[in-house]
Amino acid sequence: MLIPVGTGVGVTSVSLGVVRAMERHGVNVSFFKPVAQPRPGETGTERSTAVIRAAANINPPEPFALSYAENMITSSNTDILLEEIVARFEEHVKASGAEVLVIEGMVPTDKQPFANKLNYDVAKALDADMVFVTH
């Protein structure tokens, strides 16, 4: 799981680079972003998911909406959110047949102070190795 340590580290670029490198080496790879994190004013498909769809031969699932995740976390339903993330992840693994899934974590920001904890919880729930993305 690629986990950005802050804003502006280029986690989407790193995700795309890892996916493309694996594809070039013949690895059956896919991509998963558990929770969308749109920039102010953005609408439609989450940016990382859209970039991966456009640049690679991959059709990743839609991430959960940020507002949904925030609501689940603030109403003490993080465990349910994690169960739903795991279920979506497992469905995608089964549907894609991928050997490797590149998982992109949330960027920690002032507006999403829960991002680091959620990234850790998601990585733990998915039994994913954590790779920190820095400058």
Language-model region placement:
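Conserved beta-strand elements of the Class I
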Residues: 1, 30, 129-132
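A short, structure-level motif marking secondary-structure boundaries and short turns
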Residues: 2-5, 103-105
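N-terminal phosphate/diphosphate-binding loop that engages ATP/GTP or pyrophosphate donors
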Residues: 3-94, 110
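Phosphate/Mg2+-binding loops and adjacent switch elements
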Residues: 82-135
